[in-house]
């Protein structure tokens, strides 16, 4: 009996030690992951706060001056081209490109994402209502930057394997000749594929999974499977199917969300004047608003407002030129004018409406942020339907972004490896969408932000190097 007891204790001790080793490995992995996430977040903060915010805004100011406030002089042209080309059933995209409206819709599909809902709420909590003013400022100058991007994308587009294509990877090579230009183009393509095609789409899938789980109690894995299947079906149809979906989805989702916001603002009409007072006052004198967001400085309002504007409309990041390159237009300036409208719709319409709903709700100082704050603000007017409304909008916004980002990644994947491997890229993206719906994606968010910043650097350098080309084309505009 003593012998058997001794063997049992020894076995238990051995098993316990093995369990300890397994636990040590798991716990060590968690600590390493947390530490790595923190390192990436700190690197991303340094990249964005000390380089990109100044470079992006500075580039916008530079092009605004060089192009003589093109965002104002070409705005009417953009509106005219928008209504001239608007159609929910336009001619199908083909090897020669797509219609100007389809290109704009694909660009806006990427621009108008979950950041217009959750990101706006986070910016207002962190930077106060005054952050919206600085979002407007960054978007105003960003219009000039995105005009330059679209013009260059049109100018340096090319044909690969019988399909018209273009984007920063192509005009970067034109800006910087030789090995350096090739290196920057490859660097940009790799950063974009990682930031948008893979990790970015993982985050978008996660946003949809969270929204539907919170609103309806649906299992996140089920949501991921449905989104992945829908995405795969559209991906397999190529640019033709993506353009056909975005030209219908973007106007419908924008109108649906705008109507919801307008209803709330009509109900809260008496609070709108004070909301604008807060926006303009808190942008310069945060301490002047009693009972407002405590401890928010002018610097914080500026930082979070500018960052949200740049993240939202993507002007200067080098993403939307891939769509604008495919537009069938008479001259590059026409698509440049339409690109300006994309920033206007994203920031001055949709994001601004979200901000006004949040500010007039009076909930910003209540300690909530992100999706929770937005859902609470909409629920004040819509009741329990508020969560459902936001979940539906998150589905529209995030799924449209998945389509846009997939396409941008595909262009760069094909530039690196050739179109014969497109299905491999599609499969990888679908897997990331499926996995992302149910995972905690803090590290993925951090990596996506970091690579987003990295891809912007060569794009902005190329824009500045080719500024003379942009100015020359802008001067030669024909009515």
Where are each of the predicted segments found?
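Membrane-interface loop-to-helix entry segments
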Residues: 10, 55-59, 70-79, 188, ...
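N-terminal alpha-helical transmembrane segments of multi-pass membrane transport
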Residues: 25-109, 114, 125-130, 142, ...
């Amino acid at each position: 009996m003593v012998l058997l007891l001794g063997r049992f204790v020894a076995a238990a001790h051995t098993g316990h030690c093995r369990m300890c080793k397994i636990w040590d490995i798991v716990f060590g992995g968690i600590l390493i992951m947390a530490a790595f996430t923190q390192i990436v977040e700190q690197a991303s903060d340094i990249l964005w706060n000390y380089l990109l915010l100044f470079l992006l805004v500075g580039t916008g100011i530079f092009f605004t001056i060089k192009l003589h406030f093109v965002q104002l002089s070409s705005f009417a042209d953009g509106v005219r081209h928008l209504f001239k080309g608007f159609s929910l059933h336009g001619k199908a995209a083909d090897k020669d490109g797509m219609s100007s409206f389809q290109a704009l819709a694909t660009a806006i599909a990427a621009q108008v994402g979950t950041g217009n809902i959750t990101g706006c709420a986070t910016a207002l909590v962190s930077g106060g209502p005054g952050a919206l003013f600085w979002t407007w400022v960054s978007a105003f100058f960003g219009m000039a930057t995105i005009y330059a991007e679209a013009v260059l994308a049109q100018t340096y587009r090319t044909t690969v394997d019988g399909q018209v294509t273009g984007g920063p990877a192509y005009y970067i090579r034109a800006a910087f000749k030789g090995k350096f230009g090739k290196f920057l183009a490859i660097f940009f393509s790799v950063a974009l594929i990682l930031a948008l095609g893979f990790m970015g789409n993982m985050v978008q899938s996660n946003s949809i999974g969270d929204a539907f789980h919170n609103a309806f109690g649906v299992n996140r894995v089920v949501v991921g499977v449905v989104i992945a299947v829908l995405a795969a079906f559209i991906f397999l149809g190529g640019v033709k199917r993506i353009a056909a979906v975005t030209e219908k989805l973007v106007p419908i989702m924008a109108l649906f969300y705008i109507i919801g916001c307008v209803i709330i603002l009509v109900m809260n009409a008496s609070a709108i004047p004070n909301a604008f007072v807060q926006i303009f006052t808190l942008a310069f004198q945060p301490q002047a608003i009693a009972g407002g967001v405590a401890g928010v400085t002018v610097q914080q309002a500026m930082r979070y407002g500018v960052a949200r504007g740049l993240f939202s409309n993507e002007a200067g990041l080098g993403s939307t030129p891939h769509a604008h390159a495919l537009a069938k237009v008479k001259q590059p300036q026409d698509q440049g004018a339409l690109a300006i409208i994309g920033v206007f719709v994203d920031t001055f319409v949709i994001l601004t409406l979200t901000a006004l709903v949040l500010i007039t709700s009076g909930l910003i100082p209540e300690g909530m942020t992100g999706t929770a704050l937005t859902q609470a603000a909409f629920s004040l007017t819509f009741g329990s339907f508020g969560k459902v409304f936001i979940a539906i909008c998150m589905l529209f916004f995030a799924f449209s972004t998945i389509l846009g980002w997939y396409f941008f990644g595909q262009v760069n994947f094909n530039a690196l490896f050739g179109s014969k491997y497109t299905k491999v890229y599609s499969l990888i993206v679908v897997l990331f969408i499926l996995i992302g719906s149910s995972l905690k994606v803090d590290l993925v968010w951090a990596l996506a932000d970091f690579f987003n910043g990295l891809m912007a650097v060569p794009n902005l350098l190329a824009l500045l190097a080719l500024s003379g080309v942009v100015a020359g084309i802008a001067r030669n505009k024909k009515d």
